[in-house]
Structures are given as C-alpha cells and as structure tokens.
Amino acid sequence: MVPSSKAVVFARQMAKQIRVTTPSMSATRFLSTGDNGQVDEQQNPPEPLPNRPLRGERSSNSHREPPARQAHNLGKSDTTLSDDGFLEQFKLGVNQDSRETPKPEQYPQEPLPPPEDSDEIFKKMKEGGLIPNAVAMLDGLCKDGLVQEAMKLFGLMRDKGTIPEVVIYTAVVEAFCKAHKIEDAKRIFRKMQNNGIAPNAFSYGVLVQGLYNCNMLDDAVAFCSEMLESGHSPNVPTFVELVDALCRVKGVEQAQSAIDTLNQKGFAVNVKAVKEFMDKRAPFPSLAWEAIFKKKPTEKPF
C-alpha cells in the first residue's frame, strides 16, 4: 500500500517537529538533573524548618564528626581549660600544696623613747634583780680569787652594750667591795672616770660604804667630799653609818671633824630624816648621836 501524498507531508512535518523538540527536551532533562531543587524551590517553596541554615552558609552538621572523635575533642578542650585555670591559680598562689606563711604586716616603727636617767635605771635594775645577780656573780669570782675571770665578765657585760656603762662599772665596784678587794674597787672606779663616765650618787655611795665597812675611813671621807664636789650628796644611811664607823674607830671628835669638812663642801644634815632613821635602827650607838647633834642621847628633844 502506497501512502498518499497527504500522509507523506504529514509524516515529514512530524519528523521535522520531532527534530526541533528533541534538543529542548534533552536540555530540560539536563537542567533537571543539576538544578532540579532550585526549580522546585522557586515553584513550590518548602515549609520553614527550625534552625534551617540560610542559603550559601555551611551547615553545622555538614561535617559532623563521629561520636567517639567528638568525645575525644570535648575531653581535650576541657583539659586545656582546666590547665589554664590551674596555671592562673598557680600564679595567684591558690590551691598550692605548700603554702607560704603570710608575712606579718609591717608597721612604721615608732621613735624610741628618750633614755632614762641613770638613777632611775639603777632603781629598776635593783628592783628587777639584775644588779644583785651581776654583783653576786662578780662577788663570787672575786672571793674565789678569780679576779681575771671577774674582769672578763665585766668586759663581756660592757661589750653587750645593753646596760649603761655606769651601771656595769658600779656593779663591779660593789662586787670588789663585798669581796673586800678595796684596791681593785678603787681602781675600777678611777677607770670609769678616766673613760669619761661620770659616777652618780649611787656609784659614790657604793664605794664609800665599801670603804668604811673595811675601816678605810680616811678614804671614805675623801670620796664623800669628792662626791659633794661632783654635785651629789650621801643619803641618810651612808652618812649615819660613816659617822658611826668614825666614832667607833677614831672617836667622836674625829667624827665631828669629818662632819664639819662635809658641811664645808655643802652638805647639810637633814635633822628630821637622820632622827627617823636612827629611831628605826634603835638602839643606835649614842656616840654617833652625840657626834651628829653635839649632845648626849638623853638630851634629845622628844
């Protein structure tokens, strides 16, 4: 069967149409494979999802690591953080095993008080037992004939520098006097003066008492006169006991002569204080009373 001319023409037109439409269909198929999602989104936009990343941004889950690796990295970051914290604590000195003892706050030092008078120092040291103890040590050394050892102790006390030198010298003088080493006592006394240390009333009184207790009465009167010339006066016990020793050894007239010598040096007898002292020491030898008041004890106005 031979096709008609109309059929041939129709077939040619269909073939031509097929040749034209085939590339466009293939192109459409090509586009659909590469950008199909874009065409779909433009035509039918999807429903919004929570935390959906914007277009062009990398999703946080695009390179998700395995759970084991995530746990390892998490532990590593925590360790790094804790190490940094530890270093900061170490710098600040916190949580250390061996803590340093905190230093006490330093306050500005107050100025030292002015030095006390030597007489006041003597009084406090006698009350505290320091001078008696020093004298006892020196006295024991001197009585045992250990004068060199006593002088070494004396030098050691001086080198310490914590006690005024007049106190140390006087303690040595008193120790020698109690050991009846009067020449050594006088030598130390003169050494004190030669070194520029002025004896005080206590120093003179110690030496005068040591002298009249050893019956060295002329020296006792001489040092008592020197004491007055230096601006010091013997106290009542020293004066009365010196007069009593003079009366016992040399008689009343010699005692009265010594009193007159002291009066010429500026010594004034405190009658009331002397009477009170002698009454407390009663019965006191009448010769001393007579030498001081120039009258017999029976004539005393009580």
UniProtKB/Swiss-Prot annotation:
Residues 54-67 have a biased composition (Basic and acidic residues). The keyword tRNA-binding does not apply. The keyword Repeat applies. Residues 26-40 have a biased composition (Polar residues). Residues 26-82, 94-116 are annotated as: Disordered. Keywords: Repeat. InterPro entries: Pentatricopeptide_rpt, TPR-like_helical_dom_sf. PPR repeats lie at residues 130-164, 165-199, 200-234, 235-269. Belongs to the PPR family. P subfamily. This is Pentatricopeptide repeat-containing protein At4g38150. It comes from Arabidopsis thaliana (Mouse-ear cress).
